[in-house]
């Protein structure tokens, strides 16, 4: 979580428990973001909300503060058993669940409340041992939560607070039946604090809210501004032959500290990885085929700055919660307009500036009109000089090579780094962009 100064509302002005205020202060949080300033007054009155907010707006901190405060100010259910958590936070992806849990740990340290996390792809027994000790706040993906519920390892009949994060993504991934399964086994909606957050409050999301919540109040943040003003957007029209050279040239020119390159298919991502690796970049690959432990390790290296570029499909697009991403490159324009918003939302977060670069090639240029209509603005076109593109590009690494999750490229293995570190001399000193 990162501090932002996007409103004049201070956390200190809310009637929060001292333990929470102390944790917020220690973590450097003083001012609220708009979603926090709007939602917390409602939630602290123990009223439900359905919030529309993009990732990077501070919604995670909003619902975590509300959840912790609710548990600290609400009596523990009489006869509560060790296998009965008091709050449950459901997320669509493992990466998002992991990030929420990290943020929850910051708030939990003075409260005495125990946080547990469960998700697929990791040891069932290791996670079960944590649950056997009892948790107050359970964070996880619905599939793994249901596994434990069906086996009696978790009982949700004492739940006092529920969070459903990125509800629209839940629909996209087909998790709604799982969610309804869990809701039916919880106490009545009127006896819980219910929170739903979604990038879009579509009719199907609102229906879910009203079916399983207690007259939630709708909270919307800039509904007509689907992309952040902190993100500088630009689009290029490369030929298929020049597309890869243009990307490598722009990466050389921009020299981003932390960049994500999105492509529409696993095959294309693997191709991108092989060229970037061969060109000496420290690059990680995230697709649906990457094993869970490796995914976590790659994200850790990227977060720590030991990888500079992450190549990803949309499987990872909405689950990535990484601070300080300076650039997003849409190597392919997405087929789904919402995916464009979610992709570029990885940068320009927490009040910081970001850059989004998109390629409208022959194959995907037809997606652009729908995207621009959806985001309510035209993306500025940037021209480039074909003759100025890099031509001394090393051959790509063979795709079948095992993708190491250790740091690569400019400071280590894989490809030939230009001089072994981030201070390697660049291959040009003039811009390739032309207005």
Curated annotation (Swiss-Prot):
It is an enzyme of class 3 (hydrolase). It is found in: Cytoplasm. It catalyses: ATP + H2O = ADP + phosphate + H(+). A motif (DEAD box) lies at residues 165-168. A motif (Q motif) lies at residues 9-37. Disulfide bonds: none annotated. One of its GO terms (biological process) is RNA catabolic process. It comes from the Bacteria. Residues 243-390 form the Helicase C-terminal domain. Residues 424-435 have a biased composition (Basic residues). The keyword Transmembrane does not apply. Gene3D superfamilies: P-loop containing nucleotide triphosphate hydrolases. Residues 40-219 form the Helicase ATP-binding domain. Residues 395-435 are annotated as: Disordered. ATP binds at residues 53-60. Keywords: ATP-binding, Cytoplasm, Helicase, Hydrolase, Nucleotide-binding, RNA-binding. Its EC number is 3.6.4.13. DEAD-box RNA helicase involved in RNA degradation. Has RNA-dependent ATPase activity and unwinds double-stranded RNA. This is ATP-dependent RNA helicase RhlB. It comes from Shewanella sediminis (strain HAW-EB3). The gene is rhlB.
């Amino acid at each position: 979580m990162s501090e932002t100064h996007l409103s004049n509302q201070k956390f200190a002005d809310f009637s929060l428990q001292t333990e929470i205020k102390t944790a917020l202060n220690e973590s450097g949080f003083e001012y609220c973001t708009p979603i926090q300033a709007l939602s917390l007054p409602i939630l602290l009155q123990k009223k439900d909300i359905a919030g529309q907010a993009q990732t990077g707006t501070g919604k995670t901190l909003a619902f975590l503060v509300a959840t912790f405060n609710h548990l600290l100010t609400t009596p523990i259910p009489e006869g509560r058993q060790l296998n009965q958590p008091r709050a449950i936070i459901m997320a669509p992806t493992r990466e998002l669940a992991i990030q929420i849990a990290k943020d929850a740990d910051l708030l939990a340290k003075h409260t005495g409340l125990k946080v547990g996390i469960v998700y697929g792809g990791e040891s069932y027994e290791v996670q079960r041992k944590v649950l056997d000790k009892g948790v107050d706040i359970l964070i996880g993906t619905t599939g793994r939560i249901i596994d434990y519920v069906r086996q009696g390892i978790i009982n949700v009949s004492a739940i006092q607070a529920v969070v459903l994060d990125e509800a629209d993504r839940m629909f996209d991934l087909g998790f709604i039946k799982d969610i309804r399964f869990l809701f039916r086994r919880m106490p009545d909606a009127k006896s819980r604090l219910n929170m739903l957050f979604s990038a879009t409050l579509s009719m199907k999301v609102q229906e879910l809210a009203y079916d399983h919540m207690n007259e939630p109040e709708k909270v919307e943040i800039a509904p007509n501004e689907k992309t952040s003003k902190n993100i500088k957007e630009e689009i290029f029209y490369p030929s298929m032959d020049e597309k890869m050279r243009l990307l490598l040239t722009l990466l050389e020119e921009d020299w981003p500290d932390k960049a994500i390159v999105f492509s529409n298919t696993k095959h294309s991502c693997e191709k991108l990885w092989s060229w970037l690796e061969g060109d000496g970049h420290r690059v990680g690959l995230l697709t649906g085929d990457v094993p869970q432990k490796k995914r976590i390790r790659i994200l850790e290296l990227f977060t720590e700055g030991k990888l500079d570029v992450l190549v990803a499909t949309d499987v990872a697009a909405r689950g990535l919660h990484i601070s300080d991403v300076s650039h997003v490159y849409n190597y392919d324009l997405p087929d789904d307009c919402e995916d464009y918003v979610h992709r570029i939302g990885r940068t320009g977060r927490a009040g910081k500036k970001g850059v989004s670069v998109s390629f409208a090639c022959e194959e995907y240029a037809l997606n652009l009109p729908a995207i621009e209509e959806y985001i309510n603005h035209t993306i500025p076109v940037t021209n480039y000089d074909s003759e100025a593109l890099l031509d001394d590009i090393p051959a790509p690494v063979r795709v079948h090579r095992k993708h190491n999750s250790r740091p690569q490229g400019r400071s280590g293995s894989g490809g030939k780094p230009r001089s072994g570190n981030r201070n390697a001399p660049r291959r040009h000193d003039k811009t390739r962009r032309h207005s």
